[in-house]
Amino acid sequence: MTPQAILADLVAIGVLPGAPNARMAGYVQAYLARYGVDCAVLTGPEGDRVNLFATIGPRDVPGYILSGHMDVVPVAGQVWTSDPFRLRVEDGRLYGRGTSDMKGYLACMLAMVPAFQAMALRRPIHLAFSYDEEIGCRGVGHMIARLPGLCAPPLGCIVGEPSDLQPVLSHKGKQAMELRIKGRAAHSSQPDLGVNAIYPAAEILLFIRDLAAKLEAAGPFDPRFQPPHSTVVAGVVQGGAAVNIIPDQCVIQMEVRSVPGQSPQAITAQVLARLAALPQVQVSSCELSSYPALPPPEDRVLADLLERLTGKLALQSVSYGTEAGLFHAAGVPSIICGPGSITRAHRPDEYITVAELEGCCAMLRRLGHHAAS
């Protein structure tokens, strides 16, 4: 099948994060089975979502992982020109939810299976399909934990997030948290009988603001990123039910993005310490999502290979995060390189071009020849 035909099938299977993905996983399994490729089904702790891992070539020698996620962001509230879950072809563009992020890469991975099989690979090419990436890379960690039983230590992992097929070397880490402050409700005419949860929440918001300013002023700094320092923001604040009720609860959702070398958890810990010190209220917190930074590589082996395969110089860093940080944390050299543009991701009328799919397949074909040499 052509990558365009496969992409049409994948777009029609609109798996949202946090939802069962049996239909998508079944499609990938059936496709691989047609070419005699076995696929390990790795059920996550949720029970209704799976990662998939398949190998082409010898299993007992180090090879390369091609990794991508199967879920896509929702289309609710967006105005599309056409059905987002039906591929529309127009002037060399292929429109549909997930075309750039990142079903285009998955389609190219699958389309190249027969070519890989014909190459008599001396080093294997592994195909990794993860779930729930769009809500904090929740699924891939369960697959990474099982890699030792699935393959020899890999030489590298190519995470195919949309990068205009330009290799990307690093990204920041992230942790998103929800903070809950519980006071005591009362009638607004007798505020002394209640404990207003919004006021201590305001103290936390000011602490987050001041912490952000401290990071901006004092670093640590990494000029490869923009901005060149870690950041912390409060993105959601919810509290109160009515103006005549002393609010008994306030919720803050905050996010940290940290430069390599500074963990997001270390920054969050400062906020949690301030939260715990609040008087007269009960407090709690929970992690919404997190992933580690992808630091610049210690050597250029994988970067040099991808520059040769793509014909493009590597980009030092990007502002978004990926599953590559998790692969790296597990000891797998990792790089980001995929077709499509991040500027089109998550937007109405998301698209990828036919030329971008062709370019990705050409890059993967060159990888196959490298693995066969």
Task: Tell me the role of every PLM-derived stretch.
Residues 70-71, 93, 128-136, 162-165, ...:
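Acidic, glycine-rich active-site loops and adjacent beta-strand->loop/helix elements
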Residues 1-76, 249-253, 268-270, 354-356:
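N-terminal helical capping/dimerization or prosegment-like subdomains
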Residues 40, 65, 126-128, 284:
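A structural signal for isolated positions on well-ordered beta-strands in alpha/beta enzyme cores
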Residues 75-89, 154, 169-180:
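Acidic-glycine-rich active-site phosphate/pyrophosphate-binding loop
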Residues 90-92, 112-127, 150-153, 208-218, ...:
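Phosphate-handling active-site elements
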Residues 102-176, 372:
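Acidic/histidine-rich catalytic neighborhood of metal-dependent amide-processing enzymes
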Residues 45, 169, 176-373:
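Metal-dependent amide/peptide-bond hydrolase catalytic core
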